[in-house]
UniProtKB/Swiss-Prot annotation:
The gene is nicA2. Predicted to be exported by the Tat system. The position of the signal peptide cleavage has not been experimentally proven. This is Nicotine dehydrogenase. Disruption phenotype: Deletion of the gene prevents nicotine catabolism. Keywords: Alkaloid metabolism, FAD, Flavoprotein, Nucleotide-binding, Oxidoreductase, Periplasm, Signal. Optimum temperature is 70 degrees Celsius. Its main location: periplasm. The keyword Hydrolase does not apply. (S)-nicotine binds at T381. Residues 1-38 form the signal peptide. The lineage of its organism: Bacteria, Pseudomonadati, Pseudomonadota, Gammaproteobacteria, Pseudomonadales.
């Protein structure tokens, strides 16, 4: 292997691959579910045209990559999938903590998310429900650090008011949510931030703190940087209905974890899968593509499908240079700087939920599991990693005890997606002015195709968007290689 490295915030891309301490820093009692079972050693018989090593190379082993590889494999193309990490899943990550299956990344699915739901039906995968109904206790933490306990009914009534006011024109702006720029109004609103609209809504202190918390989570950033149309589009994808939308976002997870669906898709694909293989360069040559890995291996293919997160493009050399539109996206990046945290406390707190306003760290807190014997496992989503060191157990304990005084923290498990050099950010989120330029991000460039949740038309912040983009890439491969 070469000694060349590329760095992000002090982390070596090469050292990250072999360092579980970096991948799961700050984790107590964590055991990653074996993703290697999806690795294929054989490929469906095919005749590689043009003297290339493969018909198709897919870069990235998340849901977009697994979907694209499956589509290409089933079309008879000899397909190789390269994943930089030592695991599959991309920005999903099934693991275990305190005896429970957990998800560090994308998790929730729903029948209103058509692409991922169809895949679950295809492979016979059911759902498990999170305990987010019939809540026992709800809290809000304001930006000044004060905490207010509110009845679940009052809490729910106020977030509904705030959210419906925020998205009041979603039907008008996105009558066809899977065609994002169908209306001129969508393009016009792309000049506005979520904060611009929140300021006009006349919300109460509670409602403003609730919607700030929620929108900071979607952004993985402060709401002044978060483009308004992206939120309206997601709401439209959920049927322009608050109850339906909330059900898509917080209720159902894939039985057996996200890795179960990844494994099923890749097993079906017949693709060859290699992990711990970062790609450093992609060059279009002689009617095909030459891919260079970080140990200087050269792999050739008729087509390459890039499914890695947008924020990592800057670590890959493209020849010829990518279009100006893509270069602008690469320079801007996508917003989200979020992290995921699980906390095991000794006390049985029951079914709890809490928001914390955007300047506070623990923006979304909910019960993952609870019992008198177990205590409580809290699932916590952090909008901006800079608000807390998720690997500092003392800091985490202090914040949890502000919300739930007197609890004893038994363990924590964390994943900082921005510190992961193969993500450099969390879930997809568009800044002001980005959604209207989505076509630039989606467009194929010669023999290089682009997928990933950021490039999807519909549920861009969800697993469904990644699957959608992988299906599109599969169609585009067929058009190029037919």
């Amino acid at each position: 292997m070469s000694d060349k490295t590329k760095t992000n915030e002090g982390f070596s891309r090469r050292s990250f691959i072999g360092s579980a301490a970096v991948v799961t820093a700050g984790v107590a009692g964590l055991g990653a579910i074996d993703a290697a079972s999806a690795t294929q050693k054989t490929n469906r018989a095919s005749t590689v045209k043009g003297g290339f090593d493969y018909d198709v190379v897919v870069v990235g082993g998340g849901f977009a990559g697994a979907t694209a590889a499956r589509e290409c494999g089933l079309q008879g193309y000899r397909t190789l999938l390269l994943e930089a990490r030592s695991r599959l899943g991309g920005r999903t990550f099934t693991s275990r903590f305190a005896g429970q299956e957990i998800e560090f990344g994308g998790a929730w699915v729903h029948w209103l998310q058509p692409h991922v739901w169809a895949e679950m039906q295809r492979y016979g995968l059911g759902v498990v429900e999170d305990p987010l109904t019939n809540l026992d206790k709800t809290l809000i933490m304001y930006n000044d650090g004060s905490v207010e306990s509110i009845s679940p009914d009052e809490f729910g009534k106020n977030i509904r008011i705030a959210f419906e006011k925020l998205c009041h024109d979603a039907w008008e702006v996105f009558p066809r949510p899977h065609e994002p720029m169908f209306t001129e109004r969508a393009r016009e609103l792309d000049k506005s931030s979520v904060l611009d609209r929140i300021k006009t809504l006349g919300l109460s202190r509670l409602q403003q703190a609730q919607i700030n918390s929620y929108m900071a989570l979607y952004a993985g950033e402060t709401t002044d940087k978060f483009g308004l149309p992206g939120v309206l589009k997601l709401f439209a994808c959920g049927g322009w209905n608050y109850d339906a939308f909330m059900d898509t976002e917080t209720h159902y997870r894939i039985q057996g974890g996200t890795i179960g669906l990844i494994n099923a898709m890749l097993t079906d694909s017949g693709a060859e899968v290699r992990m711990s293989v970062p790609v450093t360069a992609v060059e279009q040559v002689n009617g095909g593509v030459k891919i260079k890995t970080d140990d200087d291996e050269i792999i050739t293919a008729g087509v390459v499908v890039m499914t890695v997160p947008l924020n990592t493009y800057k670590h890959i050399g493209f020849t010829p240079a990518l279009s100006k539109g893509k270069q602008r996206f690469i320079k801007e990046g996508q917003l989200s700087k979020g992290a995921k945290l699980y906390v095991h406390v000794k006390q049985n707190l029951g079914r709890v939920f809490a928001f914390a306003d955007e300047q506070q760290p623990l923006n979304w807190v909910q019960t993952h599991d609870y019992s008198d014997e177990l205590g409580t496992i809290l699932s916590i989503t952090i909008a901006r990693k800079e608000t807390i060191d998720v690997n500092d157990r003392d800091a985490v304990t202090r914040e949890v005890q502000k919300m739930f005084p007197g609890v004893e923290v038994l363990g924590t498990a964390a994943y900082d997606w921005t510190a992961d050099p193969f993500s450099l950010g969390a879930w997809a989120a568009y800044g002001v002015g980005q959604l209207s330029r989505l076509k630039d991000l989606q467009a194929a460039e010669g023999r290089i195709l682009f997928a990933g949740a950021e490039t999807s038309n519909g549920w861009h912040a969800n697993i469904d968007g990644a699957v959608e983009s992988g299906l599109r890439a599969g169609r585009e491969v067929k058009q190029l290689l037919s």
